C-alpha cells in the first residue's frame, strides 16, 4: 500500500476478539490491514497450537482474555511475530441482559472477568512492548453506551458495570501512561449490527428503537472500526483519556 494513503503504515497491532467475521473485531482487523498495519488477532476460538507466523500481514493466536497466563503467552507470541507492538485494541467481550433479580453471582463474575479483567490482563501483558515502541503507541479499549446510560436493552447491570469499569480504567491509563508516551482512549458503541444484536429485538421493537435514534438506524461494525482507526492512528496524537461515542445520537450527553 502507498504509505501516503495509509494511516497505519509500519505499525504493529494486537486486536482481541477478532475471530467472528460479523463482529467489530473482524472489521477492525480488515481496516487495519488495509491501512498498512501488521496484525496479531487474539481470540479464544483459535487453536492453542496454531501457527505463529505472519501470513499476509496477519497472525491468529489463541487467547482467553479472562486468564492472565493465557494473555501473557499470547502477547509473547504476538510480539515475536510482529517484531514489536505499537497499537493495542481491547475488543474482546461478552454481553447479556439478565436483570438484577435473576442475576447469579457466577454470571456477574464471568462478565467482569471477560470485559474488565480481560482488558486489564491483555493491557498488562502488552505494556512492556508498548513502552518500547517509538511509533506513538496507542491503546484503544471498547466501552459501551450501556456504561453511559445505565444498561438497558441487551445489557444488564453486570454488563454496564463491566464496561463502566473499562471506561474508568482507560482514563486512569491515560494519566499513568501519558508521561511515558502511550495514549489510551475508548470507543463506546451503541446498537451495532453484530451477532450480539441481530435478531434480538423483534421487528416492531427494532423499528421503534431506530425511530428513537437521530440517524434512524443501527450502526455497522465498519463504522465502529473507523472510530478505532482514528484513535489508533497519529490523527489523534494529542487525544488521550477520551471516550468516542459511536451511537448515531442514541445517547447524547
Identify the meaning behind each predicted range:
Residues 123, 162, 170:
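Active-site helix of classical SDR
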Residues 144:
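Residue(s) in the substrate-gating loop at a strand-loop-helix junction
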Residues 99-100, 107-112, 197, 205, ...:
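Substrate-binding pocket helix/loop in short-chain dehydrogenase/reductase
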Amino acid at each position: 500500500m502507498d504509505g501516503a494513503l495509509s494511516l497505519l503504515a509500519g505499525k504493529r497491532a494486537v486486536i482481541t476478539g477478532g475471530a467472528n467475521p460479523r463482529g467489530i473485531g473482524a472489521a477492525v482487523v480488515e481496516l487495519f490491514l488495509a491501512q498498512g498495519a501488521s496484525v496479531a488477532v487474539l481470540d479464544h476460538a483459535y487453536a492453542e497450537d496454531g501457527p505463529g507466523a505472519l501470513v499476509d500481514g496477519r497472525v491468529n493466536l489463541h487467547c482467553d482474555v479472562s486468564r492472565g497466563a493465557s494473555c501473557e503467552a499470547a502477547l509473547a507470541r504476538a510480539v515475536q511475530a510482529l517484531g514489536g507492538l505499537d497499537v493495542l485494541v481491547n475488543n474482546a467481550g461478552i454481553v447479556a441482559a439478565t436483570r438484577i433479580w435473576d442475576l447469579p453471582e457466577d454470571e456477574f463474575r464471568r462478565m467482569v472477568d471477560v470485559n474488565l479483567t480481560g482488558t486489564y490482563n491483555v493491557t498488562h501483558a502488552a505494556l512492556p512492548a508498548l513502552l518500547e515502541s517509538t511509533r506513538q503507541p496507542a491503546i484503544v479499549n471498547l466501552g459501551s453506551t450501556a456504561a453511559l446510560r445505565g444498561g438497558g436493552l441487551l445489557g444488564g447491570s453486570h454488563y454496564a458495570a463491566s464496561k463502566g469499569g473499562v471506561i474508568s480504567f482507560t482514563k486512569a491509563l491515560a494519566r499513568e501512561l501519558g508521561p511515558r508516551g502511550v495514549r489510551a482512549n475508548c470507543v463506546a458503541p451503541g446498537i451495532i449490527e453484530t451477532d450480539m444484536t441481530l435478531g434480538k429485538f423483534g421487528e416492531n421493537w427494532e423499528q421503534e428503537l431506530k425511530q428513537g435514534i437521530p440517524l434512524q438506524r443501527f450502526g455497522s461494525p465498519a463504522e465502529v472500526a473507523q472510530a478505532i482507526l482514528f484513535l489508533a492512528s497519529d490523527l489523534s496524537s494529542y487525544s488521550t483519556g477520551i471516550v468516542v461515542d459511536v451511537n448515531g445520537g442514541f445517547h447524547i450527553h
